[in-house]
């Protein structure tokens, strides 16, 4: 069934990095915000690498991101998908990142997982390169489906996000 992205991107004029997922999971679509599946490790990984308590409410999550210069969105604005599996995504329509790039100071784009990176490479690479001068960086997915990566390994891999936020 065709799904359209239900959320607006989270960013402001102080956002320095953009983290792109592939498309909201079924629990996220149901609960109305990014990475809402409690099994997804996104919020815990970010909190760990940034030495902060994990945000819990939607308002806390937005404040957490914006206070640290982080923008989030997804690489696909529309797709055919059953459930939450990236492997079952077809008929992908890429997101328009221009409003984020024109409204923020994004210096690096990170793809949360293989499917997000694939969409970036196939559809969004030129837009990302024009805006940042850098290729999108693939990070291991925080999804519970990525069982190959335990929490500690995710934290190690995602530390580059904290490094660029700190060092600029």
Predicted regions located by residue number:
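Short, hydrophobic/glycine-enriched beta-strand segments
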Residues: 16-22
């Amino acid at each position: 069934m065709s799904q359209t992205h239900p959320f607006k991107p989270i960013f402001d004029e102080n956002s320095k990095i953009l983290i792109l997922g592939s498309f909201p999971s079924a629990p996220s679509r149901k609960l109305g915000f990014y990475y809402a599946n409690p099994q997804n490790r996104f919020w815990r990984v970010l909190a760990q690498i940034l030495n902060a308590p994990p945000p819990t409410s939607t308002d806390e999550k937005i404040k957490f991101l914006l206070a640290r210069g982080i923008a989030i969105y997804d690489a696909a604005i529309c797709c055919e998908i059953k459930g939450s599996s990236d492997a079952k995504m077809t008929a992908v329509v890429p997101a328009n990142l221009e409003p984020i790039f024109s409204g923020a100071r994004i210096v690096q784009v990170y793809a949360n997982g293989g499917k997000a990176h694939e969409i970036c490479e196939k559809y969004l690479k030129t837009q990302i390169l024009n805006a940042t001068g850098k290729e999108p960086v693939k990070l291991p997915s925080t999804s519970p489906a990525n069982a190959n990566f335990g929490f500690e390994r995710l934290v190690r891999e995602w530390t580059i996000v904290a490094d660029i936020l700190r060092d600029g």
